[in-house]
Amino acid sequence: MMATDEVIRPETQPFAPQGGELVKRHSIVTRIWHWINVLAVLVMLMSGLMIFNAHPRLYWGEFGANPDKAWLEIPETNGVAFPGWTTIPSTYSLADARLWHLAFAWVLAVGLLLYLVWGLVRGHIIRDLHIRSAEWKPSHIWHDFKQHAALRFPTGAAALSYNVLQKLAYCGVLFVLLPLIILTGLTMSPSLNAGPTWLLDIFGGRQSARSLHFIAAFGLVGFFLVHIAMVILAGPINEMRSMITGWYRLPRDKEEAA
């Protein structure tokens, strides 16, 4: 799902790597976690759309049914809100969709927990995702935004570090979107409703949890689209190689290329 890992830091080396050099960018742990997440999230999104087809309306509060006012209603086309090519299974089956969804929810939740523990133990989260005070300055954020908008990507050793927009995006997914998806999913579980209800209280009811689950899921879709676009624009072969083999060729700047 994401390309986040500890990288070789230029300041820790006697000679900083130059553009054109092959460097180790992603460990085997991150690469395995990335591709498992790709599969898990894809299955969960498609099975989630099938579950949504059973009642394509969203509400706030504890209850929601056909007579109640929905804040979002997706009109049906050919009898369903989302067509079969976007769902798992492709033909309507709420029971099967829930089985797929729950099975891969465990894969996602356990994988996230293990990755976060590993990232803390290895120091990756603090070292590579921590946003320094200087990076919070509006001028710094605006500069990085303009660089991205102009498709000016870092070269040489600078390509080994995450900029503030990348850090914000990755932290938003790791610490906001994914935990929110998992917790709101638990809140909607009938087994949880029969036991402790503190999650229901936190999210304001089962229907509010369902709405937040839907919003967070499509926030994740938005991240994927931007992530894939950046991979393509930055050089898909080099980026894919780094997430398959771990090795990344540092981009050259214009002067080096000349």
Language-model features: where?
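Membrane-embedded alpha-helical bundles that constitute the cytochrome b-like, heme-associated redox core
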Residues: 1-258
